A protein has these predicted regions:
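Conserved strand-turn element in the central/C-terminal portion of the radical SAM core barrel
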Residues: 95-102, 121-152, 157-159
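Loop/helix-junction capping segments adjacent to catalytic residues or to phosphate/diphosphate-binding pockets
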Residues: 47-48, 102-106
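Active-site-proximal loop/turn and secondary-structure-junction residues that shape catalytic pockets
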Residues: 43, 74-76, 99, 129, ...
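Accessory C-terminal segments flanking Radical SAM cores
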Residues: 140-241
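Basic phosphate/pyrophosphate-binding loop/patch that engages nucleotide-derived ligands
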Residues: 105-125
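Canonical Radical SAM [4Fe-4S] cluster-binding loop centered on the CxxxCxxC motif
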Residues: 1-19, 215
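A structural signal for short, well-ordered beta-strand segments and their strand-loop junctions
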Residues: 69, 94, 124-127, 161-164, ...
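Conserved SAM/AdoMet-binding glycine-rich loop
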Residues: 6-7, 20-95
């Protein structure tokens, strides 16, 4: 990422291009249609092969995607090739707005939006008055019985899935935080898309997406405020240095 924000993990490594392609192919081999498919980071515009990824997804799977989007903090101007393929495959740029905390970003937003408009690329700049919520991952370690874990999971039911290779994760935050903070929890909390070979796989996918599993919760739930995280607002994009 181009920022060094407090309360944000910073130890994630880029996926290599082959792994990105595998993730995309595996995901869409099982999906008929998805409302929104998002490329996220860190900062996706720092990924050197971003234009190749957009072309790969656009060529093979754009018809299966409602909204094809990229989430960016607005600090990086995409190169011309990335802008061209973004226009071709109707990519929406979702621009997080941290200008209240980092006023210099207002000029960055102006420059970015100007380039997006030049190439007729859709974008959405969010309001400055946003805030982040503290999930508690870096300090919570609740001793919860199975019933409490299931209650926490059922109240949350995050809508944000993540695909990595053949693995579909129910909660992108649980997977990424466990890896970034080296908790090594929830190693088996995923659906193996490669194993969905029988005629009943769509039912299995639907059940997974609705939150049904043998355990009924994720291992990382005991480290998370879950739905109550909304009661723990924190300053947006507060910098470490």
């Amino acid at each position: 990422c181009a920022h060094a924000c407090y309360n944000v993990g910073n130890q994630t490594e880029d996926l290599d291009l082959a792994e990105v392609y595998k993730s995309v192919d595996m995901f869409f081999s099982k999906m008929d249609y998805i409302n929104e498919f998002v490329l996220i980071g860190g900062e996706p515009l720092l990924y050197k092969d971003l234009s190749k990824v957009i072309v790969y997804i656009g060529n093979k799977y754009r018809r299966k995607i409602g909204i094809f989007s990229i989430t960016t903090n607005g600090t990086i101007i995409p190169n011309e090739e990335t802008l061209k393929v973004s226009q071709k495959y109707q990519v929406l740029y979702r621009i997080s707005n941290y200008a209240k905390e980092l006023p210099r970003l207002r000029q960055s937003h102006i420059k970015l939006i100007k380039r997006l408009q030049e190439f007729e690329v859709d974008y959405k700049l969010y309001d400055e008055d946003g805030y982040w919520i503290d999930y508690g991952f870096d300090y919570l370690n609740n001793d919860m019985d199975e019933e409490k874990l299931i209650q926490t999971f059922d109240r949350c039911l995050t809508p944000c899935r993540e695909v990595r290779g053949n693995k579909l994760y129910f909660c992108v935050m649980a997977r990424s935080v466990s890896d970034n903070l080296h908790f090594n929890e929830g190693q088996d909390d995923y659906l193996d898309l490669e194993q969905l070979n029988d005629d009943n796989y769509k039912k299995i996918l639907l059940e997974f997406n609705l939150g049904y599993s043998e355990k009924g919760y994720l291992d990382m739930c005991h480290r998370c405020h879950g739905m109550d995280a909304a009661n723990y607002p924190i300053p947006i994009a507060e910098q470490l240095v």
